[in-house]
C-alpha cells in the first residue's frame, strides 16, 4: 500500500533520466524500501569537465515511534569526468546511512521542537586503485514560537547549525563549495572563474561549518484546497554564516567566515516540502562581495 513508482527525464544543459520506487511498508509496520536508477549528463559548475554519471541506489529505512528514523543503504556509481583532452573514470561502491531525531510539531513550518540528524556517505573504489573516503554530516535545528498559541499568524524563530567532515582521500574533483541556496545565501553558485581566483579560495573545501538563523512570520496560515492540497505563505529574514577548508577540520575554526543576509518567501504547496524564494547579499571580511536570488524546494533550517 502507498507504493510509488515514478520516472522522469530532462534534456538541454542538464540531461537526466531516472526511475524511482518507494514502498513504505516493505516488511510490515514502519519499515520502508526505496531504490532508484539514474543517468545524468551535465557540465560541472566550476571544474572544466562534463560529468557523465550512472548510478543505482537502494536504502532500507525504519521508524522507531514518531521521533526516530534510521536508514541504511548503498549506491553504486560509474562516473566519468571528460573534456577535450582528459577522461577520468570513477567506479565505486558507496555505503550510506542516517539517523534522525525529530520533535517538530509541523514539518512544513515548525513552531517548536528540535531536529537532529547524523549521516554518512562513503566511496570505496571498485577498481582498488584509490584510497577510500568517508564524509560525516551533522546538523541540529531548534524552533521557537514567539507569539501566543491562539495567534494563527505567529512569529517563529528558527536556528540551525551543520558540519561536514571528510576522512580519507581528499579528491579535488569531489570538493564542495560555499555560497548557494543550501549553505550561505546571498552568493551566486561559484563558476570556473571563482574557482581559479586565488582570492576566492575561501569558498572551496572538504570540511565545512555552517549556521543559519531565521525570523519567520506566517502571512497566510495553511488552508486546504479541494480536501487534498494545502497552501500557506511565510515571510522571513535570514542571516547565514559559513567556513570551509581543505586540510584538517579544526583549521576552519580559525578562518574568517563568509556571511549572507536577506529576505525569504516560503510557500507551502503540493508535491514539495516547501518552495523557498530567497534574495540576499554576501559579505566577506566586512565587504559586500555578491548578491543573489535563490529558489529551493526545502527549508534552509
Range-by-range predicted roles:
Residues 1, 27-29, 147-152, 220, ...:
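Secondary-structure transition/capping motifs at alpha-helix termini
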Residues 197-204, 248-255, 264, 283-285:
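Short, contiguous acidic/charged loop-to-helix segments that flank catalytic cores in large enzymes
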Residues 95-229, 233, 237, 247, ...:
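C-terminal outer-membrane beta-barrel translocator/porin domains of Gram-negative envelope proteins
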Amino acid at each position: 500500500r502507498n507504493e510509488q513508482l515514478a520516472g522522469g527525464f530532462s534534456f538541454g544543459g542538464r540531461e537526466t533520466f531516472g526511475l524511482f520506487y518507494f514502498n513504505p511498508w516493505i516488511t510490515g509496520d514502519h519499515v520502508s524500501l526505496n531504490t532508484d536508477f539514474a543517468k545524468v549528463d551535465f557540465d560541472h559548475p566550476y571544474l572544466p569537465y562534463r560529468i557523465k554519471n550512472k548510478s543505482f541506489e537502494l536504502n532500507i529505512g525504519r521508524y522507531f515511534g514518531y521521533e526516530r528514523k534510521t536508514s541504511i543503504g548503498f549506491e553504486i556509481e560509474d562516473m566519468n569526468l571528460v573534456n577535450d583532452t582528459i577522461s577520468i573514470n570513477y567506479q565505486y561502491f558507496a555505503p550510506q546511512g542516517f539517523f534522525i531525531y525529530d520533535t517538530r510539531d509541523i514539518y512544513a513550518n515548525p513552531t517548536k521542537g528540535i531536529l537532529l540528524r547524523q549521516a554518512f556517505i562513503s566511496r570505496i573504489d571498485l577498481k582498488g586503485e584509490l584510497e577510500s573516503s568517508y564524509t560525516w554530516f551533522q546538523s541540529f535545528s531548534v524552533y521557537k514560537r514567539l507569539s501566543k498559541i491562539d495567534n494563527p499568524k505567529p512569529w517563529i524563530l528558527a536556528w540551525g547549525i551543520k558540519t561536514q567532515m571528510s576522512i580519507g582521500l581528499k579528491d579535488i574533483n569531489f570538493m564542495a563549495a560555499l555560497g548557494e541556496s543550501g549553505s550561505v545565501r546571498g552568493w551566486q553558485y561559484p563558476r570556473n572563474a571563482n574557482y581559479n581566483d586565488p582570492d576566492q579560495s575561501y569558498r572551496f573545501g572538504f570540511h565545512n561549518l555552517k549556521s543559519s538563523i531565521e525570523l519567520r512570520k506566517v502571512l497566510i496560515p495553511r488552508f486546504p484546497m479541494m480536501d487534498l492540497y494545502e497552501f500557506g505563505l511565510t515571510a522571513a529574514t535570514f542571516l547565514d554564516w559559513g567556513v570551509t577548508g581543505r586540510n584538517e577540520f579544526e583549521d576552519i575554526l580559525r578562518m574568517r567566515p563568509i556571511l549572507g543576509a536577506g529576505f525569504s518567501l516560503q510557500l507551502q504547496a503540493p508535491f514539495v516540502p516547501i518552495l523557498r524564494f530567497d534574495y540576499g547579499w554576501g559579505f566577506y571580511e566586512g565587504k559586500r562581495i555578491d548578491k543573489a536570488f535563490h529558489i529551493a524546494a526545502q527549508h534552509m533550517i
